[in-house]
Amino acid sequence: MSAKTDEILDSLKSLSLLEASELVKQIEEAFGVSAAASAGVVMAAPGAAAGGDGADAAEEKTEFEVVLESFDASSKIKVLKEVRNATGLGLGEAKALVEAAPKTIKEGATKEDAEALKKAIEAVGGKVTLK
């Protein structure tokens, strides 16, 4: 590999999960592509090959996205603590995530985990939606 590609690879290795997610979104916007489109096609193929009914699979969602929509200004610190507990992010990263609301705080969560996180954040003054 060239020195330039080695440098880019080293930079990518040092990104946090939040930074990597933001990078993917920026790449999708800049190049007009979607990283999720390929995964959706691959995931649909096994169900179709097995002869399963696609409608049943679409009705029962197994992974959820937890989105912090907003929060009471007086509850910012409490919401920040809940986000840190749920994501394992550092203080600065969690603060940036909370202040950027509406923002996805957890992806690929089970229904139980997503609902528990929603309940915990709403209990301290945040508004959360599940997608």
Curated annotation (Swiss-Prot):
Q: Which GO terms describe its cellular component?
A: cytosolic large ribosomal subunit
Q: For this UniProt record, give its keywords in alphabetical order, as a comma-separated list.
A: Ribonucleoprotein, Ribosomal protein
Gene3D superfamilies, A to Z? 3.30.1390.10, Single helix bin
Q: What molecular function terms (GO) are annotated for this protein?
A: mRNA binding; structural constituent of ribosome
| Gene Ontology biological-process annotations | translation
Report the coiled-coil segments.
none
InterPro entries in UniProt: Ribosomal_bL12, Ribosomal_bL12_C, Ribosomal_bL12_C/ClpS-like, Ribosomal_bL12_oligo, Ribosomal_bL12_oligo_N_sf
What exactly does this protein do? Answer: Forms part of the ribosomal stalk which helps the ribosome interact with GTP-bound translation factors. Is thus essential for accurate translation.
What is the similarity comment for this entry?
A: Belongs to the bacterial ribosomal protein bL12 family.
**Assembly and interactions?**
Homodimer. Part of the ribosomal stalk of the 50S ribosomal subunit. Forms a multimeric L10(L12)X complex, where L10 forms an elongated spine to which 2 to 4 L12 dimers bind in a sequential fashion. Binds GTP-bound translation factors.
Name used for this protein in its record: Large ribosomal subunit protein bL12
The upper taxonomy is: Bacteria, Bacillati, Cyanobacteriota, Cyanophyceae, Synechococcales
